């Protein structure tokens, strides 16, 4: 294959994945990232003996990452160590009940005094339902990288498509049809956290997230998630990708509906045959291609930002024995919590909190007798009238109050290190649209759960990867998006070659 030039804007997991696959296919690939690390939101904080994953903390579907190494006849295990966690996470509820989530249902029954045989049987039936949706989506959405409802209907047929994704149900409606216990409903509904959305608004097709985790397991990257990003960076370099960190792309140059190259922050121009943007779609169109405010507003009506977060990294000089590696402290009213975040657009009164304590699996992540707590409640993305510092401060107190009331006794007294990220920090560091963490919200009414297509509808050689495009947010999905974009570009090149011979 001729050495066509490809520029990757941004080195998140989608960008580095696309870079690797395109380099493996023989393209001349250059990747530019404004930050000084590869991995995007897979970022790292190490201080005073504590280690924190600043972004994602859970690895699922590791085979998607392993495939990148396999294409080069290499094995991921030679680059990074991952460990399967039998106890996937622990859920705490306001009445004192605790439910441990195991991938083995018999183990889950034996470990949870609050669950009955009927509960486990209902869960088994629900997982059978979710598996059918998972298998249906594997054939077109994942395997072929289909981007639109019309493409899926064309491939699968109308009636089969409607039935295959339980089209007329939301995720929570589907869960509630099978599960009677409210706490199990809340726990399963919060799998929607992977895409920063509401289970009451998201389509039922996203129940596949639950089956994926049960089938593929939940994994920990030894030493922290950033080790996986470092492994991918090493593979990219070995495949010949030219990686330029600390270099920002300021604009994209065009000729009618064709991209000719990019302008860097040092004023230089770099030409390319294809551009793959790992920046979110709307920031790319708004900031690099200077779309009008009216056009951006039209796009956001369909592709609204997903949730952001108020992220607290706490180093504490106490060990909390009741915590697992991954923990969820649930709101007393999950439906209200979703409504406040996704509809009222306010800081929730009683948030559901995700709490990571990787020290439970990896003692190197905190000094002896200490723990590294990452605390993440979802909050709205940046609004036209942003929250004030006082509002964030009040919210911090509510979060700490909830943690202490639900078992983290005297937490405030034991905090010896604290680092906080608001949506403004997320937007400034990663360039995400309005500080969203998960790209585009999955909403049955707005977009049927679909995100932007991976190929631009305005430019013939511009592609996108990451959480704002299909197949969606979360580490494995954004990584898969990079591989799917590489497949699309390869297909285009094959078509060009074939056409030129005719």
From Swiss-Prot:
GO terms for molecular function: oxidoreductase activity. Pfam families: Amino_oxidase. FAD binds at residues 8-20. Its cofactor is FAD. Keywords: Carotenoid biosynthesis, FAD, Flavoprotein, Oxidoreductase, Virulence. Its EC number is 1.14.99.-. Pathway: Carotenoid biosynthesis; staphyloxanthin biosynthesis; staphyloxanthin from farnesyl diphosphate: step 3/5. One of its GO terms (biological process) is carotenoid biosynthetic process. InterPro entries: Amino_oxidase, Carotenoid/retinoid_OxRdtase, FAD/NAD-bd_sf. It is an enzyme of class 1 (oxidoreductase). It comes from the Bacteria. It catalyses: all-trans-4,4'-diaponeurosporene + 2 AH2 + 2 O2 = 4,4'-diaponeurosporenal + 2 A + 3 H2O. The keyword Cell membrane does not apply. Belongs to the carotenoid/retinoid oxidoreductase family. CrtP subfamily. Involved in the biosynthesis of the yellow-orange carotenoid staphyloxanthin, which plays a role in the virulence via its protective function against oxidative stress. Catalyzes the oxidation of the terminal methyl side group of 4,4'-diaponeurosporene to form 4,4'-diaponeurosporen-4-al. This is 4,4'-diaponeurosporene oxygenase. The gene is crtP.
């Amino acid at each position: 294959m001729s050495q066509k030039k490809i520029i990757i804007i941004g080195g998140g997991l989608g960008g580095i994945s696309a870079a690797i696959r395109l380099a493996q296919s023989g393209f001349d690939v250059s990747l530019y990232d404004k930050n000084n690390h590869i991995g995007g939101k897979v970022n790292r904080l190490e201080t005073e003996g504590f280690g924190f994953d600043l972004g994602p903390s859970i690895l699922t579907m590791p085979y998607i990452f392993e495939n990148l190494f396999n294409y080069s006849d290499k094995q991921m295990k030679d680059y990074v160590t991952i460990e399967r966690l039998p106890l996937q996470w622990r859920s705490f509820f306001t009445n004192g009940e605790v439910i441990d989530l195991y991938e083995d249902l018999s183990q889950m029954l034996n470990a949870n005094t609050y669950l009955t045989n009927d509960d486990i049987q209902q869960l088994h039936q629900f997982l059978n339902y979710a598996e059918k949706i998972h298998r249906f989506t594997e054939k077109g959405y994942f395997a072929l990288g289909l981007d639109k409802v019309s493409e899926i209907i064309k491939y699968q047929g109308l009636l089969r498509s409607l039935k295959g994704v339980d089209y007329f149900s939301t995720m929570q409606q589907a869960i509630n049809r099978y599960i009677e216990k409210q706490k199990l409903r809340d726990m399963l509904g919060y799998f929607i956290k992977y895409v920063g959305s509401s289970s009451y608004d998201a389509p039922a097709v996203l129940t596949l997230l639950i089956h994926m985790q049960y089938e593929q397991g939940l994994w920990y990257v030894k030493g922290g998630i950033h080790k996986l990003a470092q492994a991918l960076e090493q593979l990219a370099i070995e495949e010949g990708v030219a990686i330029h960190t600390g270099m920002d792309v300021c604009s994209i140059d065009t000729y009618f509906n064709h991209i000719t190259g990019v302008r860097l922050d040092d004023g230089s121009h770099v030409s390319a045959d294809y551009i793959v943007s790992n920046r979110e779609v709307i920031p790319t169109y708004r900031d690099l291609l200077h779309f009008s405010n009216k056009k951006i507003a039209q796009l956001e009506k369909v592709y609204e930002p997903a949730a952001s977060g108020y992220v607290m990294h706490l180093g504490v000089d106490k060990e909390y024995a009741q915590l697992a590696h991954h923990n969820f402290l649930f709101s007393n009213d999950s439906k209200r919590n979703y409504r406040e975040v996704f509809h009222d657009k306010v800081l929730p009164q009683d948030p559901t909190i995700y709490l990571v304590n990787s020290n439970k699996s990896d003692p190197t992540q905190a000094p002896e007798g200490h723990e590294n707590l990452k605390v993440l409640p979802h909050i709205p993305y940046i609004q036209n009238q942003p929250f004030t510092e006082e509002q964030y401060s009040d919210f911090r107190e509510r979060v700490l109050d909830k943690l202490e009331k639900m078992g983290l006794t005297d937490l405030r007294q034991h905090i010896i290190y604290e680092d906080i990220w608001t949506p403004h920090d997320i937007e400034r560091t990663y360039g995400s649209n309005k500080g969203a963490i998960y790209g585009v919200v999955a909403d049955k009414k707005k977009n049927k759960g679909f995100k932007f297509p991976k190929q631009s509808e305005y430019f013939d050689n511009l592609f996108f990867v990451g959480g704002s495009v299909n197949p969606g947010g979360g580490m494995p999905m954004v990584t898969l998006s990079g591989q799917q974009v590489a497949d699309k570009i390869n297909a285009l090149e094959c078509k060009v070659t074939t056409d030129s011979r005719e």
